[in-house]
Amino acid sequence: MNLVDSIARYSKGYDLPQNLVMAVAKVESNLSMHALRAEPAYRWMWNVETHKPFRRLNNPEVVSNEAPFDFPRPVEFFASNDTEWQGQRMSWGPFQMMGAVLRERRYKGPFPAICCDPDLASKFACSHLSRLRDRFYKKHGWAGVVAAYNSGTPRKTPDGVYTNVGYLNKVSISGAQKYLTFLRA
């Protein structure tokens, strides 16, 4: 199955607007399955043993390429703790999901598989978007859901503009105008 078909399948399965999901993938990667980006300052790591956020990182750990001694890795496949550390701090595949978010969504496989399997990428992105919808839609609408996809939570400036309005506008003009209207820079 190709990416477009996978997006159609999983957006329907998770009751998400297909155009919105497609627009997110267009903005994140231009629909490239092989998109990959290092995010070395990312600090919200996931503990795969407790299935909870990993402890707060100190400043040297945030910039380190090596995992702290107590950072666990999945036992389901062979990878070092350092590989897991780096993988959680990268965004993967057509939806550019952070490795830590993939672990939070209970993805247990090797991260590069997200860049090779459209169904896998679409399934986890739609699962994550549906979770964000369930948390934020009533109060913030689709703009808040998409803002949270990009930055973790929907955040606004004191004058009521989303802090990542530029991202929201890109998603809107990429095919989600129906869901993201009346935004301003």
Each predicted region: which residue ranges?
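N-terminal export signals and maturation junctions of secreted/periplasmic proteins
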Residues: M1-G13, L31-M33, E39-R55
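General N-terminal targeting signals
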Residues: R37-A38, V48, I114, Y162
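Non-catalytic cell-wall polysaccharide-engagement segments
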Residues: M1-Y14, R55-A185
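Short, solvent-exposed loop/turn elements at domain surfaces
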Residues: M33-A35, R105-R106
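Catalytic phosphate/metal-binding cores of nucleic-acid and nucleotide-processing enzymes, i.e., regions
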Residues: A23
